[in-house]
Amino acid sequence: ELQACRDGYIYIHDMSARRDTMNCCLFDVEHVLKGGFEMGNLWYNEPKTLNVAFDVIGDIVLSAASQQYGGFTVPSVDLLLEPYAERSYKMLTEKYTRLGLDADTVEKEVMADILNDFEQGFQGWEYKFNSVSSSRGDYPFITMTAGTGKSRFAKMATITMLDVRRKGQGKDGHKKPVLFPKLVFLYDENLHGPGKELEDVFEAGIRCSSKTMYPDWLSLTGEGYIASMYKKYGRIISPMGCRAFLSPWYEKGGMEPADETDVPRFVGRFNVGVVSLHLPMILAKARQESRDFYEVLDYYLELIRKIHIRTYAYLGEMRASTNPLAYCEGGFYGGPLGLHDKIKPLLKTATASFGITAFNELQELYNGKSLVEDGQFALEVLEHINEKVNQFKKEDGNLYAIYATPAENLCGLQVKQFRKKYGIIENVS
């Protein structure tokens, strides 16, 4: 394994961190907030107003995100904030009514106050998540998704979040959009299309996109896996951080639905780590040694499988006290656990990923053509990897997944590793 890593045939992401904690997640903030929770040996009551909810959620996110090394996502933040806006509405209406104001003035003042709370809250998050480092010493990769809430306050949440990002932060005349939280717009053509009830929310997203690189747009009603889960079950799969999407875990049946009424669960689940294949190097090795490519590929797939099995076993021995908000206060599905309980029961719904990179270079090395010109071999390889990973899932009972590794930095390393072993090949290295 170490030699495979050194040579570059596989790459273990976050090698040191993966032995301490999990990777990325869809954190269930709603479950943590409901009824109150404990954080840092202090009891927090559930917020009674919107502005307090913003403060408390910000604290939860920074605390929990510091206990992991991958992307931290708060899914459907518009629906998360909606009940706290309703509480503020009720409280403010009673307050202004007691002052003897007429009903129209009360409504106007209350809605203005709630809008201001949303603006200040989202602005506060932007400052907090980009200037307050976590206890790990870095700035966590925080993502928030929104866009499907239909109530007036859910819509107000999404629109205000997008407007705050569009306007940017900083000195007058020098404002620029911040990095975190990364925003993802959940697009449903039946809600956001022309003349539909959330068209104004869609327009706010377009205005934001016209000025910034945000939000990312995730189609819930297009084609593919994400859309299929939404169309069949009405369940949204938000990305964990940047672009990692969870495989389904069914509430009754686990990896497979138990019956027609079984539904998948995504919120509150996480990933335990990624190990990526270096496919062009594996093909080059097979050719140099006059061996069957798939035989060599299977060797490295088995290597990754063993690493994942050990990761599940190692993490399973850890205690819930290593991340109390996640394991003990409801942030992760399957809890809450006691502080001294092992986290093994929660790992059954967690994914471990086989990363894939450089398919274009693989195809170029195979026959000198790009994916656009041919691509058949690359597709066959991906189908083979998919079959093997599904086989491993059934045999091991672990929820393995395939991950298209972004490889922003890894790609440079992989080129150097390829050159060192196999030299410079046009359109490959």
Segments predicted by a language model, with ranges:
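Contiguous, well-ordered alpha-helical segments that form the cores/surfaces of helical PPI scaffolds
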Residues: 352-365, 383
